[in-house]
């Protein structure tokens, strides 16, 4: 079993790029397709705490439930926002990566490089053509 876990959405380019950077370090992570297998309340609360971000910072804003539920309004408690994320996992921003070096919301995808123990094994270019890692495995930005 891998010591890296990614909460992944294969339809998301940022999530796909993050997964490939993990693989470029020589590790095959545990992949949780969080839309199909959402985290439990306790797991979600722990992820948020470990990332050191607010509950609201994990909310995706550009999805239908956000508008339908009126989540832009500042009237909801953190517990209520977590309830909404559990009921509508599409509201959980992604990808979230957990490694021995920390837990991060990897937006942009190269944030994952900050928490990988192993160096990149070679060049990495994002799907959009942006070069992130050179041939020697060194981060470019």
Curated annotation (Swiss-Prot):
Q: What is the effect of changing residue 60 to K?
A: 22-fold decrease in catalytic efficiency with arsenate. Mutant shows low-level resistance to arsenate
Q: What is this protein called?
A: Arsenate reductase
Specify the effect of residue 127 to D: 13-fold decrease in catalytic efficiency with arsenate. Mutant is sensitive at high arsenate concentrations
Q: Which gene encodes it?
A: arsC
Q: What reaction does this catalyse?
A: [glutaredoxin]-dithiol + arsenate + glutathione + H(+) = glutathionyl-S-S-[glutaredoxin] + arsenite + H2O
Q: Which family does it belong to?
A: Belongs to the ArsC family.
Please tell me, according to the UniProt entry, what happens when changing residue 8 to P/G/R: Loss of reductase activity. Mutant is sensitive to arsenate
Per the UniProt record, the lineage of the source organism begins with:
Bacteria, Pseudomonadati, Pseudomonadota, Gammaproteobacteria, Enterobacterales
Which consequence is recorded for altering residue 128 to A? Answer: 4-fold decrease in catalytic efficiency with arsenate. Mutant is relatively resistant to arsenate, but is more sensitive at higher concentrations
GO terms for molecular function, please? arsenate reductase (glutaredoxin) activity
Locate the active site: 12 (nucleophile)
């Amino acid at each position: 079993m891998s010591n890296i876990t990614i909460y992944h959405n294969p339809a998301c380019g940022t999530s796909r790029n993050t997964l490939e950077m993990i693989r470029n370090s020589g590790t095959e992570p545990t992949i949780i397709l969080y839309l199909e297998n959402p985290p439990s309340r306790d797991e979600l609360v722990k992820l948020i705490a470990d990332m050191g971000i607010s509950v609201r910072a994990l909310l995706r804003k550009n999805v239908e439930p956000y508008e339908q539920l009126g989540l832009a309004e500042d009237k909801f408690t953190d517990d209520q926002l977590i309830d909404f994320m559990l009921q509508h996992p599409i509201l959980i921003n992604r990808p979230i990566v957990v490694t021995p070096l920390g837990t991060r919301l990897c937006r942009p995808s190269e944030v994952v490089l900050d928490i990988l123990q192993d160096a990149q094994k070679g060049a990495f270019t994002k799907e959009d053509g942006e070069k992130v890692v050179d041939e020697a495995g060194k981060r470019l930005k």
